[in-house]
């Protein structure tokens, strides 16, 4: 069960695995407010995803580890699972959509995982992973709809709240909802006055549509340059957490994201991935 104690436990477990990324104050991007970036692109594996995947794997039983782990991913969760599994001597198989960037495919292999490329998008890779789990008996590590994974992502909020005493709001990119669920749950329990806002692409508005319709919606198709959040259906757990703790979700267009990518480079020399440039 998700709890604040679980998030703090994740922070303890992850201390020897991840980097604590310091917030970076920006100048010029948003002159009317104090804007800080949390550069998880500097995290090991290049993404926050390793927080959730590494904590989840740390919580597996000896029997679950012995079966080997299987995961599906648009690319970043894949690398986190591969790294954490290899560090623990666990066999890993990752299902990736064939649209995943070759750099992420090769990095996943480099961290020690076997890769299965699946025609289509993330959701097709998910279906293949479930099929192989049932057939081969692997332990499945979900990329976002898992309480241990969500707790791992929630450690980001612990770091942000520790770094910034007077923070008003946290803005988070949304795909399946694991990141924003962890951040919102943690932030609201520690500092309830902090607003948490999500941002999702107009070409993949699964969580946005679900929240506004009051029930989980599955998209027929997703089409966005932000491949890391191109998810047709949010998670059951993440939907409930977002509904309860997130203040609002906004949609942004492909053009807005393309323009926003340039701002962090210009003002902080940090390159934002399309998935995060939607903020």
Language model: regions and residue ranges:
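PLP-dependent amino-acid enzyme catalytic core
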Residues: 1-273, 277
């Amino acid at each position: 069960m998700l709890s604040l104690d679980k998030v703090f436990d994740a922070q303890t477990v992850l201390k020897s695995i991840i980097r604590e990324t310091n917030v970076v104050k920006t100048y010029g991007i948003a002159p009317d407010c104090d804007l800080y970036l949390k550069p998880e692109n500097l995290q090991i594996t290049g993404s926050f995803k390793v927080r959730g995947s590494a904590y989840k794997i740390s919580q597996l039983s000896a029997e679950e580890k012995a079966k080997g782990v299987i995961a599906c991913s648009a690319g970043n969760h894949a690398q986190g699972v591969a790294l954490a599994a290899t560090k623990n001597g666990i066999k890993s198989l990752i299902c990736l959509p064939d649209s995943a960037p070759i750099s992420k495919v090769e990095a996943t292999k480099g961290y020690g995982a076997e890769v299965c490329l699946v025609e289509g998008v993330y959701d097709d890779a998910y279906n293949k992973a479930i099929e192989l789990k049932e057939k081969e008996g692997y332990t499945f590590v979900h990329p976002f709809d898992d309480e241990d994974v969500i707790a791992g992502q929630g450690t980001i909020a612990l770091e942000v709240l520790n770094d910034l005493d007077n923070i008003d709001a946290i803005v988070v990119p949304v795909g399946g909802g694991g990141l924003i669920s962890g951040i919102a749950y943690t932030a609201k329990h520690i500092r309830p006055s902090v607003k948490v806002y999500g941002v999702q692409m107009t070409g993949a508005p699964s969580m946005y549509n679900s929240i506004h319709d009051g029930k989980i919606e599955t998209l027929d198709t997703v089409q966005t340059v932000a491949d890391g959040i191109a998810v047709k259906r949010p998670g059951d757990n993440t939907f409930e957490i977002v509904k309860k703790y997130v203040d609002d979700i906004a949609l942004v267009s492909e053009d807005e994201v393309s323009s926003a990518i340039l701002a962090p480079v210009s003002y902080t020399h940090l390159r934002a991935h399309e998935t995060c440039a939607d903020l």
